[in-house]
Amino acid sequence: VETHGNRNADGGGGAPGFGNGLPNPRNGVPGGGSSVPGRAAGSGPGDGTGAPAPTASAGSAPSAGSSAAPVAAHPPVVGLAVSQRMYLPAGGGAQDLHAILTVRVEGVSGIEGADPGGAAPAPSLAEVLVVDCSASMKAPEKKIRAARQAAVTALKALPDGTPFAVVKGTHRAETVYPPSGPMRPASAQTRAEAERAVYAMMAGGGTCVGNWLSLAGELLAEQGAPIPHVLMLTDGRNEHDDRNPLAGVLDTWQGRFVCDAWGIGREWDARLLVRVTSRLHGSAYAVREESELPSAYDDLITGLLAKSLPELEIRVLISPGTRLRYLRQMFPTEGNPPQTEDGRAIAFTTRAWGNEVRRYQLCLTVDPAGRELGEDLQAALVEVAVPGAPPGSPAGSVSPGSLSVRLPPAQPCVVQWTDDPVLARTANEEVDHFAKHRQLGDTVALAADAFRLGRRNEAVTLLGVAVSLAHELGAQTQLAELQRIVEIRDPAAGHVVLRDGVQQIDFEYLITMSTHTTQGPTADGRPAGGVTVQPVAGLTDCPNCHVRVPSTAKFCPNCRHLLAPRVEAP
């Protein structure tokens, strides 16, 4: 727990930069609103993640059906830090207690190919490529051509032995490869066969995303790989949802595979992509030019292959009198991890880890009734665990093989009730940072709705608020998208002017990118914001209509004005 600048940086044998200023809560920190041991009342707890020495040893039994593999000499290390505002006013009744959980994983090796006929362990990854082949994909024809090429690019990037399938999506869902049976392992032969099947796909029909994801989930469930992944592309809207309602499909498959989704063209629905990826633990993306899609797919598959730790659980052990409101992923993208409950412990499943940092916002409801002032009380205990391991396990085994993982000590979420108004108003920079990110996303969505309904003045006002928030947060990606819609006169004050030629699709890109967040204040508490607004790379203003156009364009696509060669960005 970070309180007003107190941070223990002693690594404690775990991930660098994480300290362990408390006794190991796995060894018996009492719950039930009791005082946190080892500290005087009112002192700031540590936020450490020193990882204890692993107890899982080399030679532990591999999971059923996989080949034995030696445990790495230096297993992956998981770190956990909790940062929160701990002081709440005693006279305010039941209130929300917010904490930011930072989970860091280090020492993960990427996914490598497997020899299907050899003794190597089964591959960690199984991949299903879902390609929108609805009628709109042939208007223009270059969309379906780019989709085919992107799918082939992704196939070529898969390591040998990786099980894969290709699904053609319309109002129905059809497995075009393999033509029958289960997913096939990647090889020169199966890639060539799949490539022919992909290039034979023709556009026609409607769109039912529920059917696409259901078929992908069934293929992956039959395969049983530790890291099941879906890469979905669409250019439209879920117009045939009644055939297989998406809400029920997401309820069925949440937590069972990861889905990354891409928008292409001019008619796709950003909210649809965000809805799918936030429930299926993925990310939403979009490309403005069809030609960008193959390289974007290649980059995504490359990043995916760096994730070989299948999953971790964030467990929240609630003290009596505390109620869990939610846990959300806030960085690097926003999402809602699925949860299960077993007694007092609530487990949230997080999928497919590489060497990375993710941040989560935990919200608990606590009540001061019957509690002493000035005493540190444990509202909950947070731990990172391997799925299936008993509570308090210092290390565990993750499929495939016998991969040992070094887990950190659990960390308490602490509340201290106070009648000091100064303490009660003390903010936490990290909590505030992500609250502003959510405000940014909400503001962008409201601006999009106002623009769609013709309320341009309202849209401009909201876009000004969004620019001010993005500037404060240091969110360059969002600022770049905002610059396509407005001319930014004063980013701090939110003074903006709507550009000519703005279309609704520009807001779809903005909504999509608003789910990609910045990490927040650094370990020493410095804020992340206040950045200089940078010009969008490769764009310039048309001197005639002032629409943002590619700097290499010979004429403006909006007003057809002839542009001078090599126009420089302002």
Say what each PLM segment does.
Residues 366-570:
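Long, acidic serine/threonine- and proline-rich intrinsically disordered regions
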Residues 83-84, 93-311, 369-370, 474-475, ...:
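Exposed acidic/Ser/Thr-rich ligand/metal-binding surfaces
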Residues 331-355:
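Extracellular adhesion/glycan-binding regions together with long Ser/Thr-
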Residues 1-118:
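Acidic/polar low-complexity segments with low predicted structural confidence
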Residues 320-328, 389-393:
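Short aromatic-acidic-glycine turn motif
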Residues 81-87, 298-299, 344-349, 364-366:
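Short structured motifs
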Residues 353-373:
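Low-complexity, intrinsically disordered segments enriched in Ser/Thr together with acidic residues
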Residues 2-11, 17-31, 35-42, 46-54, ...:
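Negatively charged
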